[in-house]
Amino acid sequence: MEHRFNDDSLSLHTDLYQINMAETYWRDGIHEKKAVFELFFRKLPFDNGFAVFAGLEKAIEYLSDFSFTESDLAYLKDELGYKSDFIDYLSGLSFTGTLHSMREGEIVFANEPIMRIEATLVEAQLIETALLNIVNFQTLIATKAARIKGIIENETALEFGTRRAHEMDAAMWGARAALIGGFQATSNVRAGKRFNIPVSGTHAHALVQAYRDEYTAFKKYAETHTDCVFLVDTYDTVRSGIPNAIKVAKEFGDKINFIGVRLDSGDLAYLSKKARTMLDEAGFHDAKVIASSDLDEHTIMNLKAQGAKIDVWGVGTKLITAFDQPALGAVYKLVSIEENGKMNDTIKISSNPEKVTTPGRKRVYRIINQLNHHSEGDYIALEEEDVHSEDKLKMFHPVHTFISKFVTNFVAKDLHVPIFEQGKLVYDNPDIQTIQAYVQDSLGLFWEEYKRISKPEEYPVDLSQKCWDNKMQFIHDVKNKIKKELYESE
């Protein structure tokens, strides 16, 4: 089937209302106003104690290439009815703004700005949907992977979710996010090529079925592959699968690298113990027992509690789909806008207290105790505040303000780094291995109580006094303005 508009520009990866708002701004002449938006989420996923930020590399690619193609413009004009003068304006648009962001792999928490975008009102508005799409998905997968890796610890974790992912790009970028979260390899060959990450795979039940019996299938596989992992549960794991894997491994000897056996069904606790015993008795003490079959952190924790002898964990569906929480819920809110040549803060008020935004351009600092090298909490301050010059900080809960403490002898780590400055890319995103190491190093700053899988302690994310006062003043002013308008209308 032929399509008239057959290219696939990511600049149209947006909601229609973003373009509608862009046209409103442009026709009203306010499109060049400077605006500051912040991207954050309100609630940690999976009831976890932290999240792992992922998606910066994709965001960099998106912003670097942001422009409307001739096909985009033709579609907007011919199919959606936008007028020629607005189309002409869009034809010259690119991202000329500034992006400050947390590093990819940063440990992040609810209500702290992960990204801060400073651009013209039109540019900042048009990129909202794509940035949220990128960060919402990849951060969710990286966080799920980190939860699983936290249970597996030093054992190997493999990402096996490609066929169950929501589509091809989700599989590829999800594989990358899983490695950021701590996984060692993926089965996705495209992701391996695209991101230069390790790939790993065995064979399917179809191989055994094609040859009708396990011995022949394993033998043929060994004849064509040096590294061998045999899938042993096609017929009978204990009486047929494992014995035939051992038989082929002995026959081929040093001609192959017998990595181990994979279990993909049945009672994994029982079967892994049987497999370990049978492999050891056959002299294959270094052979690994690899398990898959709808695993997640909860199943893995239960298997470990039952004494399962599993060395390598292949996790697919429940990782790549973020099975128990398929959405992160990140939002993108305007916090400051230019008026009469001056930046003025802005706030969104809601009857839901958690949806009231914090006005102003802000930075996030991690307050690290220099004596025990653990984090005391994250501290959100207005851009103009010089936190590094402070010898003593008052940290207090932004809602329950009576919960407070004073911190001395600390280092304030600025979590934001410049990515784009006035449209120019100024940041070199590190490779996966470096990001992965950064995640693990960063997790070392937190007490175990914040990292446990079930009912973790709430990590402090506090506002500076100046930031909090600014927010309270805005709430007060908005309420008074509404009261005045109601009074005058009566």
PLM region descriptions:
Residues 2-34, 43-45, 81, 87-96, ...:
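Buried, small/hydrophobic-residue-enriched core segments of structured protein domains
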